[in-house]
Amino acid sequence: MQHYGTRGVHGQTVEVLAQRILTGQFAEGATLDITALQSELDVSLTALREAMRVLAAKGLVDARPKRGTFVRPRDDWSLLDPDVLRWQFSRATRPGLFSDLHELRSIVEPGAAGLAAERATGSDVEALDVALAAMASAGDDIGAAVDADLAFHRALLAATHNELLQRMEVLIETGLAERDRMVHGAGPGDPVPSHRAVVDAIRRHDSADAARAMGRLLEQAVEDVARLADENR
C-alpha cells in the first residue's frame, strides 16, 4: 500500500496533519485554524480541504457549522484503518501499542497456523518456503528482512483459506513492519529456525505442532522487543 506521504502535496499534507493529531500537538476538541495552516504549510486551500476530507473519513477530524474543523476524540478514530495504524506505530504515539499487537497476534496467529496445517495446499507451502528462503538470504538488509517476514505472515494467513483471517493481514502487518524495522535494526538472532518450525509442522499437516511452533515464535518476538527496550534504557 502506498503511503500518503508519497502521494504529492495532498498526501504530504495528510501526513503532517495526522502526525500532529496523533502526537497531541493538535489536542482532542481543538479547532483547527484553516487559514493559518494554509499559510504555514504553503499549500492551496483545495489541497488542505482534500487532506481534511481524508482525515475526516478516518475519524480524526470533523467540521460543523459555526464551530469549524476540529479534532475528534480518540474513541472516534478509525483505529483499524491502515494509515491510522501506521501513523500510530511509526510514532509510538501510545504506550503499550506493541503489547496490544502481541496480544492480538497471540490470539490470532497460533490458531491460524493450526488451521493452515489442516488446509494448506502445495502452493501454500511453496509460498511459505519462498518467504523462508528470502528471510535466509536477507542478511543485514533490514528492508529485505522486513519484506520477507511480512511475506511469511501473509502466506500463513492465506494458507488458512479463511477470508476473514486473511483480512487480518492489514492489522497485523502494519504493526509487524514497524516492530521488525526496530528489532532487525538492532541485530537480533537468526529468525529462520523459528519460522521454519512453523512451516515444517504445516507441511506435515500437524495442527497442534504448528500452533505450538507459532506460539514459540511469538514468545521470541516479545523477548526481542524487551531486550531492545532494556538496551535503550
Predicted regions mapped to residue ranges:
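Amphipathic alpha-helical protein-protein interaction surfaces
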Residues: 121-124, 161-165
